[in-house]
Every structure is written in structure tokens, then in C-alpha cells.
Amino acid sequence: MMNEHTVKRQGAHPKALPYLFLTEMWERFGYYLMLGIFSLYMLDSQQNGGMGFSPEEKSDIYGTYLGLVYLTPFLGGLLADRLLGYRTSIFIGGLLMAAGYFGLSMKGETTFYVSLLLIILGNGFFKPNISTLLGNLYNKEEYRGNKDSGYNIFYMGINIGAFASNFIAAYFRINYGWSWAFAAAGFGMLLGLMVFYAATKHIREADVIKPMEEGDMSTGRILLFTLVPMFAFGILGYLIPGNLLGTDSNDAFIFGCIPVVTFF
């Protein structure tokens, strides 16, 4: 019994856990480094190396960016499940984000928007799939009982990366300027991908593509039913500020108070 218990404790976590921990740590390092200086960069004058946007423009861009960052993981997870697999999706996502961070270190408004698009798409491919890959590793009977603690360790990497990014961002911004601060995020993401590549032999068996089963909706139909409403509501939101529904009091009353009064 003692020998069996000892063996079980020694094999408590998959060998890939430290690699995924470090990969996620470096990815979140880059993500939160960029996010931490994003608003300041947009507001800073072009003479100082910033974008020189107005507070209103900054708010629109920042809000749109965050909204799309939280939308794309659904699409990236779907494509990984059905078509690409988790490992390939993570590599694609990491490379796109690294390219986006390096793009932000360059000047030009077009480059700025293209870089944001790359980060948004990269996050969609990366973020949901590394967590799913870790979960698949814990599906083995020998690891299943330690899944919660494994995720706790994994998420600690997020906290460490986010914490360290603040100091690195401040150091590079103060001493070398905006470009080097964004480039540091790109190098962090590349380091994470190097660590992930080293884990290939430990994660291969967990990288599975789920075949469609009878009754499943096709990938094309899922994308249709998600993307069309997204663009429709996006256009509606763009048009609303120019009319009566553009004030907080009116739309809150129409869409919030009236249904409550009607049904309750």
C-alpha cells in the first residue's frame, strides 16, 4: 500500500504541466504588458512616440478591442475542436500575438490597427485551447484526482506573468520608449512558444480533434449564427448614438424598465 501510494504521489501531475505553466505565464506577461500601457500609448502625443488619440477615440478603440478579445476564443476553440487541433491552434495564436506586439512597436496608424487585429485573432486561437489541452492531460485516471490542484498551479502562472509585466513595461517605457515596451511583450510571447515547443512529446496524446457526431451543428452554421448577429449588433451600436436611443436614460428605460414593469 505504501509503495502504491508513493508511486501515485510521484505521478500526481502530467509532465507537461510545468511547460504549460511557463507557456501561459509568458503569454499573459505579453498580454497584460500590452494592456497595461495601451491606453497611455493611445493618449500620448505623437511627439513622444504615442498615437495622439483623443480620450473619446481611445475609449472607442479600447472598448472594441476588449470586446473582440473576449469574443474570438469561442471561434478559436471551435476551430481547434473541429479542424486544427489544440497544439496547432496554440502555435498559430502565439505567433499572431507576437506579430501584433512587434507591430505595435512600429509607427503608423495602419500598422496600429493591423497589429490589434493580429492580437485579437491570436488570443482567440491561444487562450481557450491551452486550458483545454491541460484538461485533456488530466483525463487519465492517474491524474484525474489532482485536476483542481493542477489548474491552480497553471493559473498561478497567469498571476506571475501579469505581476511581472507591470515592472518590465514601466522600465522599458521610461528608459527606452513605447516601442521597446511593446517589443518586450513580443519577446515574452516567443519565449512562451519555445517552452511550448519543448513540451511537444508530453502533450501529443492530449491533442485530439473531436469528430462531429450525429445531431451536431456544422462548423459553418455555427459561425453563421455567431458572426452575423455580431456584425448586426455592431452596426446597430454604431448607428444608435446618432438618434434618440443614444442616451443612457432612454435606452435604459426602453430595454430595462419597460420589460420589468410589463412582466412583473
Across the structure, where does each feature detected by a protein language model lie?
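Hydrophobic core of transmembrane alpha-helices in multi-pass small-molecule transporters
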Residues: 100, 111-126
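Interfacial helix-cap and linker-helix signal at transmembrane-aqueous boundaries
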Residues: 42-43, 79-81, 103, 168-177
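Intracellular loop-helix junctions on the cytosolic face of multi-pass helical membrane proteins
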Residues: 1-19, 141, 170-264
